[in-house]
Structure formats: C-alpha cells, structure tokens
C-alpha cells in the first residue's frame, strides 16, 4: 500500500469511526472526541499493518548458511494482536524454536515474524500455525515449534469475564514431533508440563 493509499484509507476509516460514535449515542464533535475518529483510524492501521508485510522476506533478509543442528530458541517474545471475532486485543508471549538444517536466521527476525502475523485480525490458533509454517517454509529446518500464551480481552472484558484466564496454543513440525525434543524445548522455556 502506498502512502497516498494509506492516507485515503485513514480518511475513510476516520469518517466511519465518527459514524460509529454517533450510533453509540455520542457527539463526535464534542471537545473530548474531536480527534478520536482520526486516532482510532491510525491505531487500527498500526494494529493491522502486518497485512502489508512479507514475513518470509524478513527471514530471507538475514539467512545464513551454518553447520549447526541444535535447538535455537527465542522465548518470551511479547506481542499484541486483535481478535477477529470482537476486534478486541489479545496479548502475551510467544516462544519460538527451531533446529537448523544448513540455514539459520538473525535472532531478531523471529520476533519480527511474530509481529507481522500478530498485527492482523487473528485467532491465537492461526497465529501459532502461521509463525510455524513461515519458519518451516523459509528455513527448511529439521523442526519448528511455537508456543503462545495469551490473555484475551474478549474473555476478560465481556462474555465470561474471566480476568485471570490464559490461553496456551502450540504447533510443531519435524524433530519436535519426538516427545523428548518437545520436552527439552518446554524445559528450556520454563514451561515444563
């Protein structure tokens, strides 16, 4: 999306958010809300900017040949996303591991991949799988594992209203299908089951 397209989209979003405020019984022209439609439009563009980014290109930009075939883990990756069902935030930590098969990537690239997929309207299950598949398809490692722990505002602010609930998802390929390899990963991230 070009800058002009982004500005046009922001302007249209701003108009729609002003209408939403009116439909909720608010006056979008009152002092406290004058800039709210623009702020919300910009926030939504930021929170969904992952649609305009290529996560595989991020990994390929720092892909190196290396003779290392032990686990590589980046844990406690903070992320936030938006639930596609209610458009409310969910946030938490992602733990990503892979066992290289000739290629490694820059360590900072794994959190960047998490962010690209998280900054879209999501469900946690799909987010977990998309991260795993991106790493598997790009690096072709011996195995990939992703564990995500998150709090969902759609469960805490509305619906069942369970403030201390935590949702955990995992997905894995290759070498991580072996329970001992998975157990090693879980021990290393401090999530032994």
UniProtKB/Swiss-Prot annotation:
Pfam families under this entry? GTP_cyclohydroI (PF01227)
What does the UniProt keyword field contain? Answer: GTP-binding, Hydrolase, Metal-binding, Nucleotide-binding, One-carbon metabolism, Zinc
Q: Write down the superkingdom of origin.
A: Bacteria
Cellular component (GO) terms are: cytoplasm
* Top EC group: hydrolase
Question: Which GO biological process categories is it annotated with?
Answer: one-carbon metabolic process; tetrahydrobiopterin biosynthetic process; tetrahydrofolate biosynthetic process
Instruction: Establish whether keyword Endoplasmic reticulum is in the entry.
Output: no
GO MF terms on file? GTP binding; GTP cyclohydrolase I activity; zinc ion binding
Q: Answer whether the UniProt record assigns the keyword Zinc to this protein.
A: yes
Its pathway is:
Cofactor biosynthesis; 7,8-dihydroneopterin triphosphate biosynthesis; 7,8-dihydroneopterin triphosphate from GTP: step 1/1
Indicate what this protein is called per its UniProt record: GTP cyclohydrolase 1
Chain's gene name: folE
Q: Which residues bind Zn(2+)?
A: 83, 86, 154
Originating organism? Porphyromonas gingivalis (strain ATCC BAA-308 / W83)
């Amino acid at each position: 999306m070009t800058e002009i397209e982004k500005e046009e989209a922001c302007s249209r979003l701003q108009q729609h958010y002003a209408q939403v405020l009116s439909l909720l019984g608010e006056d979008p022209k009152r002092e406290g809300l004058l800039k709210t439609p623009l702020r919300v439009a910009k926030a939504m563009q930021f929170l969904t900017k992952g649609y305009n980014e290529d996560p595989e290109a991020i990994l390929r930009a720092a892909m190196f040949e290396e003779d290392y075939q032990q686990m590589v883990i980046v844990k406690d990756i903070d992320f936030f996303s938006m639930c596609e069902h209610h458009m409310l935030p969910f946030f938490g930590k992602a733990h990503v591991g892979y066992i290289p098969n000739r290629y490694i990537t820059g360590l900072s690239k794994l959190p960047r991949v998490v962010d690209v997929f998280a900054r879209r309207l999501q469900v946690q299950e799909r987010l977990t799988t998309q991260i795993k598949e991106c790493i598997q398809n790009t690096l072709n490692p011996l195995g990939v594992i992703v564990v995500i722990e998150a709090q969902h505002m759609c469960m805490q602010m509305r619906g069942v209203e369970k403030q201390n609930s935590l949702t955990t998802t995992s997905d894995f390929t290759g070498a991580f299908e072996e329970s001992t390899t998975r157990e090693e990963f879980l021990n290393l991230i401090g999530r032994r089951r």
